[in-house]
Amino acid sequence: MSGSECLTLIGEYVMAQEIERKFLVDGDFRSEAFKAVRITQGYLSSVPERTVRVRVKDDKGYITVKGVGDESGVSRFEWEKEIPVDDARELLRICEPGVIDKTRYLVKVGTHTFEVDEFYGDNEGLTVAEVELSDENEAFDKPSWLGEEVTGDAKYYNSMLMKNPYKNWK
């Protein structure tokens, strides 16, 4: 496990420390993507101290708990477990209003893989890219399509996009 993954063992699951930076996308990245997957996700809880997310990613289901981020917004605790996809679909029915619908593209840049999310529905027109790092000061290549950094800006958190979608920002 990398430094960003191994932190605390809880039962048979690892509580990870997620270290990532987030950017707006300002240009065409699709020709560089090596994979695309449709994601639907909702939140059972979206309080600032922790979020509990349910996700359907292709034909797999997941439940994820994320803790509060550090002051910079770069790192926070995360625990994720794969669950049966039918269970995830059922849990989506009881999530808070504002289910997120997006396509995630994976784009290799240097030694890192960027996850580029293109949103639909109430968040249509918003595209963000995240890169996971092994520590907060790790250097990475920045592609030409990477725009303004929005790491730590809560309005770009998926849990906030369901409450205050992109269509309401204009």
Language-model-detected regions and their locations in the chain:
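Phosphate-end processing signature that detects enzymes handling 5′-triphosphorylated RNA
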Residues: 3-170
